[in-house]
Amino acid sequence: MTTKPQKPHILVCNDDGIEGLGLHALAASMKKLGSVTVVAPAEPQSGKSHGMTLGEPLRIRRYQKNNRFFGYTVSGTPVDCIKVALSHILDAKPDLIVSGINYGSNTAMNSLYSGTVAAAREGAIQNVPSLAFSLTTYENADFTYAAKFARQLAREVLRRGMPPDTILSANIPNVPEKEIRGILFTRQGRSRWEESTIERHDMYGNPYYWLAGSLQLHDNDLAEDEYAVRHNYVAVTPITCDMTDHRFRSELETWGLQNTIKK
């Protein structure tokens, strides 16, 4: 008598918060692959990067959608969600962590600010294969194809595995599937967020500030993530937790600083 293979367990998180439509689309798509647990921030946490909450308590709440249990909220950052899920909510490590689907791309230097990418990176730090998904729009979002692609990529990762301390960050154009030109495995580009700071004043005349700006293109190669998505390709970028510049480290050896210490 053969036993049925156990379905994989997938942890779903995001940085847009528990009510984010991309989160709900991603969770629904993952349920076609296995069992799903949703743990997401109680409030939007965009731009929190790898921040975590210290010096104040975290609170976990059960969240219902249409009078049915949907998942858990955590009163903290996306990284807090992963840490709390693995230490207090789940009985065992999941087979996969997926984060998203984010409103707005997380390409190039933008990925450094991203809570969506950070949640996946925390998963990799905790030795769980992890993926991040982002849609290249902030309005009129259609998550249909992004959710479908997320399932395709997740299925392959569940089958093939991932290198340690590495995540995949996928950026998907906000266009119908028929307009997707292909899937490219890209590198992190050099495009970066260029800010403009808006000054305003409260009723007492005290100044306060809003950060604004846009991602400016500094790439011209389909091998770079931002350039690829702007040309309607899905860009999948492997990102490592090791932030060492190994080439420059070798050059530093030639500076001779190590010989200046008198013993």
Swiss-Prot record:
The Enzyme Commission number assigned here is 3.1.3.5
Q: Which cofactor does it need?
A: a divalent metal cation
Catalytic reactions on record: a ribonucleoside 5'-phosphate + H2O = a ribonucleoside + phosphate
InterPro entries per record: SurE, SurE-like_Pase/nucleotidase, SurE-like_sf
Instruction: Report the subcellular localization.
Output: Cytoplasm
Q: Which domain of life is it from?
A: Bacteria
Q: Which GO terms describe its molecular function?
A: 3'-nucleotidase activity; 5'-nucleotidase activity; exopolyphosphatase activity; metal ion binding; nucleotide binding
Q: Name one GO cellular component term.
A: cytoplasm
Keyword terms of this UniProt record: Cytoplasm, Hydrolase, Metal-binding, Nucleotide-binding
Q: Which residues cross the membrane?
A: none
What does the entry comment about cofactor binding?
Answer: Binds 1 divalent metal cation per subunit.
Q: What is the enzyme's main class?
A: hydrolase
Its signal peptide is: none
- Binding residues for a divalent metal cation: 15-16, 46, 102
Q: Which SUPFAM superfamilies match?
A: SurE-like
Role description: Nucleotidase that shows phosphatase activity on nucleoside 5'-monophosphates.
Q: Which family does it belong to?
A: Belongs to the SurE nucleotidase family.
Spell out the PANTHER family in the cross-references: 5'-NUCLEOTIDASE SURE, 5'_3'-NUCLEOTIDASE SURE
UniProt-recorded name of the protein: 5'-nucleotidase SurE
Q: Give the organism the record lists.
A: Chlorobaculum tepidum (strain ATCC 49652 / DSM 12025 / NBRC 103806 / TLS)
Q: What is the lineage of its organism?
A: Bacteria, Pseudomonadati, Chlorobiota, Chlorobiia, Chlorobiales
